[in-house]
From Swiss-Prot:
Phosphorylation of isoform Beta on serine residues is constitutive. Phosphorylated at Tyr-14 by ABL1 in response to oxidative stress. Ubiquitinated. Undergo monoubiquitination and multi- and/or polyubiquitination. Monoubiquitination of N-terminal lysines promotes integration in a ternary complex with UBXN6 and VCP which promotes oligomeric CAV1 targeting to lysosomes for degradation. Ubiquitinated by ZNRF1; leading to degradation and modulation of the TLR4-mediated immune response. Residues 105-125 dip into the membrane without crossing it. This is Caveolin-1. Residues 82-94 are annotated as: Interaction with CAVIN3. It comes from Canis lupus familiaris (Dog). Homooligomer. Interacts with BMX, BTK, GLIPR2, NOSTRIN, SNAP25 and STX1A. Interacts with PACSIN2; this interaction induces membrane tubulation. Interacts (via the N-terminus) with DPP4; the interaction is direct. Interacts with SLC7A9. Interacts with CTNNB1, CDH1 and JUP. Interacts with TGFBR1. Interacts with CAVIN3 (via leucine-zipper domain) in a cholesterol-sensitive manner. Interacts with CAVIN1. Interacts with EHD2 in a cholesterol-dependent manner. Forms a ternary complex with UBXN6 and VCP; mediates CAV1 targeting to lysosomes for degradation. The lineage of its organism: Eukaryota, Metazoa, Chordata, Craniata, Vertebrata. InterPro entries: Caveolin, Caveolin_CS.
Length: 178
C-alpha cells in the first residue's frame, strides 16, 4: 500500500492505509505519517460524507432546484379554489419527493456503480493512454522541429537572403513631367 496523501476542499488530509514497514518507494512511510500528526489523517476510501449538505460544491443549484412555484402559477384574475391550490401544491411536492426517493432507491446504486466504472475507465485511460501519447507526441514533434530548423537554416535562409539582396538594389525614381 502506498502512503499517497490528498487534501480536500475543507483542508482534511486523506491517505491510503500505511504499512508498518513502509514500501519500496518510501521505506520510512510510518515515520513520515507520525510527523504529520498535527493534521487529522483520514483514509481516502472511507471519507466521511455529509448527510445534511449533499451538494457541497453546488453542482445542481441551477438545474434541478424546481419547486411548485417554478412549474405551476396562476396569474391575477385566474385563481382556482384555495383548497385545490393547496392540494395541488401538496400533491406536487409529495409526489416529487417520494418519486425521487423511489427512483434513487431503485437506480441510485446501479447508477453509482455505472458512473464509478465510467470514471475509473476515464481516469485509467487518461493516466495510461492520453498523457503518455501526448508526451510521446511532444518528444516526436521536438525531434521533427530540429530537423525542420536545420532545413530552414540550410535551404530557406540562404535563398531568401539572396532574393532580398537582389531586390535591395532596386530604386524607384518618380519624376513629374511638365
Amino acid at each position: 500500500m502506498s502512503g499517497g496523501k490528498y487534501v480536500d476542499s475543507e483542508g482534511h488530509l486523506y491517505t491510503v492505509p500505511i504499512r508498518e514497514q513502509g514500501n519500496i518507494y518510501k521505506p520510512n512511510n510510518k515515520a513520515m505519517a507520525e510527523e504529520m500528526s498535527e493534521k487529522q489523517v483520514y483514509d481516502a476510501h472511507t471519507k466521511e460524507i455529509d448527510l445534511v449538505n449533499r451538494d457541497p460544491k453546488h453542482l445542481n443549484d441551477d438545474v434541478v432546484k424546481i419547486d411548485f412555484e417554478d412549474v405551476i402559477a396562476e396569474p391575477e384574475g385566474t385563481h382556482s379554489f384555495d383548497g385545490i391550490w393547496k392540494a395541488s401544491f401538496t400533491t406536487f411536492t409529495v409526489t416529487k419527493y417520494w418519486f425521487y426517493r423511489l427512483l434513487s432507491a431503485l437506480f441510485g446504486i446501479p447508477m453509482a456503480l455505472i458512473w464509478g466504472i465510467y470514471f475509473a475507465i476515464l481516469s485509467f485511460l487518461h493516466i495510461w493512454a492520453v498523457v503518455p501519447c501526448i508526451k510521446s507526441f511532444l518528444i516526436e514533434i521536438q525531434c521533427i522541429s530540429r530537423v525542420y530548423s536545420i532545413y530552414v537554416h540550410t535551404f530557406c535562409d540562404p535563398f531568401f537572403e539572396a532574393v532580398g539582396k537582389i531586390f535591395s538594389n532596386i530604386r524607384i525614381n518618380m519624376q513629374k513631367e511638365t
